[in-house]
Amino acid sequence: MTDPLLKCTTRHIRIFTAITQNNNLIEDSDHLTMDLDPDNEFLWENQAIEKVQNRFSELVESQVGQELSDYVLRKIGSDLESYIRQMLQAGEVSYNPDSRVLNYSMGLPRTPELL
């Protein structure tokens, strides 16, 4: 019997025990795949994307040798959400004004008028 697909879905991060092939998810219990900001709520520079990918790799590597569970995936997802919030507050990413819905899920934008 194969292991079931594990996944974690937060507001801005989706993590799956799978690999991508031709834009399809293929179950693979030996790999984790992250989908960053699937709703395009933020504007991302390549450097910011790389920072999140590197943080994801660090969090995954810290779990090597541990049993992979829903809890572990949720913890990684929550840690990445916090990391994105820090990046938003530092101005490394910004809200996408062309997003389908502007709900400011991580707080109002920090602008001189609001400070």
UniProtKB/Swiss-Prot annotation:
GO cellular component: plasma membrane-derived thylakoid membrane
Designated gene of the protein: ndhM
Stated role: NDH-1 shuttles electrons from an unknown electron donor, via FMN and iron-sulfur (Fe-S) centers, to quinones in the respiratory and/or the photosynthetic chain. The immediate electron acceptor for the enzyme in this species is believed to be plastoquinone. Couples the redox reaction to proton translocation, and thus conserves the redox energy in a proton gradient. Cyanobacterial NDH-1 also plays a role in inorganic carbon-concentration.
The organism of origin for this protein: Prochlorococcus marinus (strain SARG / CCMP1375 / SS120)
Main location: membrane
Name of the molecule in the record: NAD(P)H-quinone oxidoreductase subunit M
UniProt keyword annotation of Flavoprotein present: no
Location(s), subcellular: Cellular thylakoid membrane
Substrates-to-products reaction catalysed: a plastoquinone + NADH + (n+1) H(+)(in) = a plastoquinol + NAD(+) + n H(+)(out); a plastoquinone + NADPH + (n+1) H(+)(in) = a plastoquinol + NADP(+) + n H(+)(out)
GO function term, MF aspect, one: quinone binding
HAMAP family (UniProt xref): NDH1_NDH1M
Membrane topology designation: Peripheral membrane protein
